[in-house]
Amino acid sequence: MKNYLIIGIILLFPFRLFADEPVKAIYAKITNPDNKEVTVVAHRADWRFAPENSLAAIESSIRLGADVVELDVQKTKDGQLILMHDKTLDRTTTGKGKVAEWTLDSIRTLRLKNGAALRTKHRVPTLEEALLTTKGR
């Protein structure tokens, strides 16, 4: 559990670079013990519309009005941060093996699979791409 907490804190740091009014408002809402409003969190983004953790799923979550889009991050062989829930590529992409054994350039050649395990046109995004997609929204 301690490792997950540390990873969560480390991953929240880049969001401070992109913090603006929408982020501050959501943070204030979810940390207020007197808040009676429901906060909608899109787990792995809108994975029913597009592959989980894809830019299309993030865009759909925003269009649907989610307050928060929860994403998963893994590190590639060359130290790049990508959106990927699993430690392996097998379930969610057309590739096989551990994310940590692939470079970002190699992962860019793969396609994401949808919830039915069918190949899509979508590619694995980087954390930076996700942050830029959500900035100010």
Give, region by region, the residue ranges found by the protein language model:
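Phosphate-group recognition and catalysis centered on beta-loop-alpha active-site segments
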Residues: 18-137
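Bacterial Sec-dependent N-terminal signal peptides
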Residues: 1-23
